[in-house]
């Protein structure tokens, strides 16, 4: 495997995995808060 498709020293698949995980976490927390009435009060 070559590092031609990387930005700096971080592989794009690693960046995508981290960003995707954080995005899913934020969405999960949003729906969790909305389900328990915390998000709807904002």
Swiss-Prot record:
Family to which this protein belongs: Belongs to the PsbJ family.
Location within or outside the cell: Plastid, Chloroplast thylakoid membrane
Pfam families according to UniProt: PsbJ
Paired cysteines (S-S): none
Organism: Oltmannsiellopsis viridis (Marine flagellate)
Major location category of this protein: plastid
Official protein name in the record: Photosystem II reaction center protein J
Subunit structure, interactors included: PSII is composed of 1 copy each of membrane proteins PsbA, PsbB, PsbC, PsbD, PsbE, PsbF, PsbH, PsbI, PsbJ, PsbK, PsbL, PsbM, PsbT, PsbX, PsbY, PsbZ, Psb30/Ycf12, at least 3 peripheral proteins of the oxygen-evolving complex and a large number of cofactors. It forms dimeric complexes.
Keyword list, A-Z: Chloroplast, Membrane, Photosynthesis, Photosystem II, Plastid, Reaction center, Thylakoid, Transmembrane, Transmembrane helix
One GO CC term on file: photosystem II reaction center
Gene that this sequence comes from: psbJ
InterPro entries per the UniProt record, alphabetical: PSII_PsbJ, PSII_PsbJ_sf
Membrane topology of the entry: Single-pass membrane protein
Listed GO biological process terms: photosynthesis
Function: One of the components of the core complex of photosystem II (PSII). PSII is a light-driven water:plastoquinone oxidoreductase that uses light energy to abstract electrons from H(2)O, generating O(2) and a proton gradient subsequently used for ATP formation. It consists of a core antenna complex that captures photons, and an electron transfer chain that converts photonic excitation into a charge separation.
Transmembrane segments: 10-30
């Amino acid at each position: 495997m070559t590092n031609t498709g990387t930005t700096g020293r971080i592989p794009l698949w690693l960046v995508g995995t981290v960003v995707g995980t954080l995005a899913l976490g934020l969405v999960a927390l949003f729906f969790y808060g909305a389900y328990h009435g915390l998000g709807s009060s904002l």
